[in-house]
C-alpha cells in the first residue's frame, strides 16, 4: 500500500547561484525530489525562491554549509550537488562522503548528460572566455551550430535541460569554458578538443600552489582527444615535455622554435598552418598580441573541426570581442575609455595595459588575490601617468606601486563612483590617450561578480560623459 512505501530520496543542491539553480531544475525535471540550501538570506533571493518553490523545488534560505544543516534529512539524503565556488575538500562534504552520501559537482552531472555531443573544453588562467566566444562565433558563422556554457554563458546543466526539452536540431558542438574549480571536481570530462590558453598564478588560496593548479588544468587536457597549447605562455612552454602531445601555436613573429610549432604568424602577418598560408591575421580587429594568440588557438580548433581558412577569416572579420574584456565604451575629449573588468588578476591586467595606448589613466583595485605583480607594475611605470585605486586592496596596492618606483599620481577611493569622475579630470589634465578600468583584483568586496562591476563602470562613464559632450 502507498502509505508504507519508502519516501523518495532527497537531493540537495548547494547555493542559489547559477550552477546550483540549474542543477536543481535539471534534476527536478527528471523527477528527483530536490531542495536547495542557501547560506544567505538576501532579500533579492525572494523572487527566485518563489519561482523555484512553484516548480516544486524547496528552497531553504539562511542554511550554512555545515553537517548539522543536513541532519534533519540525513536518512533520506542520497545526493549533494556542489557548485564550483565550494571547495571540493570542504569539511562538511567530507563528512557527508563518510556517511555514504554521493557528492557530485554540477559540471560532472552535466557531462554525464551531454557527453554524446562533442565538447571543446577550454581552460587557462586568462584568455579562455575570449577563445570560447571567438570559437563559438567562428563555428556558427560557418553554419556549424554550437553552444557555449560552463564557466561562462549558461550553466552546463541548464544547457542539458534545454536540449532535453527542445524539439529543434541539437548543436553539433558544445564550446565549454572550464575553470580549475570545475575541472577539479569532474575528472570524467573528456573533450574531443582541449585548449589550454595560459597559466599564471591564480586561485592559489584554494589550490595551494602553482604546481597543484597546473596539475588540475592538465587533467582536462590529458583527457582530450585533440590538444591545443599556447607556446607563447612561458609556463606551458617550459613544461612542454610534461604535457601530452598536441598542437602548439605562437603569435611571436620571430619564434626561434618555429620547427616545433603547428600554427604561427609569419613576419608579414599571415596565419600559417604547418607551412601553409591560411589568411592574414588582420582579419581580427581586436587589439593586443594576446588576441593574436587567441586567434591561433581558435584557428587550430576550427581547422580540426573541418573549417577552411577562408571560412575562419570571414568569421573573424565580424567578431567584435566580448563584454568586460578591453571593451571600448566611450571616447571623451579624444580619450578612449575601456572597460576591462574581467581582468581579475595581475597577469590579465598587465595584458590590458600592454594593449592600451599611452599615456594611460588606470583605475585598479578590488579584493586582492595572490599572484605575481612585477610585470604589471612595470607596465604601470612604462605607460601610466596616474593611478586611481579602489576597494579593499587600495591601500595595499598604493604601497606596492609606490615602493616599486612609480612616480606618477596615485589617488585612493573606496568606491568606483568617485574614481570615474577623478579619472576623467586627470585624463584632461595629463592629456591622456586612454582611461583603462582594469582592476587586477576580484570583485567580491563590493560586487556579485566582474560583470556587475563592469556594468557599473559603464553606467558611471555614461553619466559622466554628458558633462563633456554638451
From Swiss-Prot:
GO cellular component: cytoplasm
Pathway in which the depicted protein is active: Cell wall biogenesis; peptidoglycan biosynthesis
Residues engaged in binding ATP: 124-130
InterPro entries membership: Mur-like_cat_sf (IPR036565), Mur_ligase_C_dom_sf (IPR036615), Mur_ligase_cen (IPR013221), MurD (IPR005762)
Main location: cytoplasm
Keywords: ATP-binding, Cell cycle, Cell division, Cell shape, Cell wall biogenesis/degradation, Cytoplasm, Ligase, Nucleotide-binding, Peptidoglycan synthesis
Disulfide bonds: none
Reaction(s) the record says it catalyses: UDP-N-acetyl-alpha-D-muramoyl-L-alanine + D-glutamate + ATP = UDP-N-acetyl-alpha-D-muramoyl-L-alanyl-D-glutamate + ADP + phosphate + H(+)
GO BP field: cell division; cell wall organization; peptidoglycan biosynthetic process; regulation of cell shape
Function as written in the Swiss-Prot or TrEMBL entry: Cell wall formation. Catalyzes the addition of glutamate to the nucleotide precursor UDP-N-acetylmuramoyl-L-alanine (UMA).
UniProt-recorded name of the protein: UDP-N-acetylmuramoylalanine--D-glutamate ligase
Amino acid at each position: 500500500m502507498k502509505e508504507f512505501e519508502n519516501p523518495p530520496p532527497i537531493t540537495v543542491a548547494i547555493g542559489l547561484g547559477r550552477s546550483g539553480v540549474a542543477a536543481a531544475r535539471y534534476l527536478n525535471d527528471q523527477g528527483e525530489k530536490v531542495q536547495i540550501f542557501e547560506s544567505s538570506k538576501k532579500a533579492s533571493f525572494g523572487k527566485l525562491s518563489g519561482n523555484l518553490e512553484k516548480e516544486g523545488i524547496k528552497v531553504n534560505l539562511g542554511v550554512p554549509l555545515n553537517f548539522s544543516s543536513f541532519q534533519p534529512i540525513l536518512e533520506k539524503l542520497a545526493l549533494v550537488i556542489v557548485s564550483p565556488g565550494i571547495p571540493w575538500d570542504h569539511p562538511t562534504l567530507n563528512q557527508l562522503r563518510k556517511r555514504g552520501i554521493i557528492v557530485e559537482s554540477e559540471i560532472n552531472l552535466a557531462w554525464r548528460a551531454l557527453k554524446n555531443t562533442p565538447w571543446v573544453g577550454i581552460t587557462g588562467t586568462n584568455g579562455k572566455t575570449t577563445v570560447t566566444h571567438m570559437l563559438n562565433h567562428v563555428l556558427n558563422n560557418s553554419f556549424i551550430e554550437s553552444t557555449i556554457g560552463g564557466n561562462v554563458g549558461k550553466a552546463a546543466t541548464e544547457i542539458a535541460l534545454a536540449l532535453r526539452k527542445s524539439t529543434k536540431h541539437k548543436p553539433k558542438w558544445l564550446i565549454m569554458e572550464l575553470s580549475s574549480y570545475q575541472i577539479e571536481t569532474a575528472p570524467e570530462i573528456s573533450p574531443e578538443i582541449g585548449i589550454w590558453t595560459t597559466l599564471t598564478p591564480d586561485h592559489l588560496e584554494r589550490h595551494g600552489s602553482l604546481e597543484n593548479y597546473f596539475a588540475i588544468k592538465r587533467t582536462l587536457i590529458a583527457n582530450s582527444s585533440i590538444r591545443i597549447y599556447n607556446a607563447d605562455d612561458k609556463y606551458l612552454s617550459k613544461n612542454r615535455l610534461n604535457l601530452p602531445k598536441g598542437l602548439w601555436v605562437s603569435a611571436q613573429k620571430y619564434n626561434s622554435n618555429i620547427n616545433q610549432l603547428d600554427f604561427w604568424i609569419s613576419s608579414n602577418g599571415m596565419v600559417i598552418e604547418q607551412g601553409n598560408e591560411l589568411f592574414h591575421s588582420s582579419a581580427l580587429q581586436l587589439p593586443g598580441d594576446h588576441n593574436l594568440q587567441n586567434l591561433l588557438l581558435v584557428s587550430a580548433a576550427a581547422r580540426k573541426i573541418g573549417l577552411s581558412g577562408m571560412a575562419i577569416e570571414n568569421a573573424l572579420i565580424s567578431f567584435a570581442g566580448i563584454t568586460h574584456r578591453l571593451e571600448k565604451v566611450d571616447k571623451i575629449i579624444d580619450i578612449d575609455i575601456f572597460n576591462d573588468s574581467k581582468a581579475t588578476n595581475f597577469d590579465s591586467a598587465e595584458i590590458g595595459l600592454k594593449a592600451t595606448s599611452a599615456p594611460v589613466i588606470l583605475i585598479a583595485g578590488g579584493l586582492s588575490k595572490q599572484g605575481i605583480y612585477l610585470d604589471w607594475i612595470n607596465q604601470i611605470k612604462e605607460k601610466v601617468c596616474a593611478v586611481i585605486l579602489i576597494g579593499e586592496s587600495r591601500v595595499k596596492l598604493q604601497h606596492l606601486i609606490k615602493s616599486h618606483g612609480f612616480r606618477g599620481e596615485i589617488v585612493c577611493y573606496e568606491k568606483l563612483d568617485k574614481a570615474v569622475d577623478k579619472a576623467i579630470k586627470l585624463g584632461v589634465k595629463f592629456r591622456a590617450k586612454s582611461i583603462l578600468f582594469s582592476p587586477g583584483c576580484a570583485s567580491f568586496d563590493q560586487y556579485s561578480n566582474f560583470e556587475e562591476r563592469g556594468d557599473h563602470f559603464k553606467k558611471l562613464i555614461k553619466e559622466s560623459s554628458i558633462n563633456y559632450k554638451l
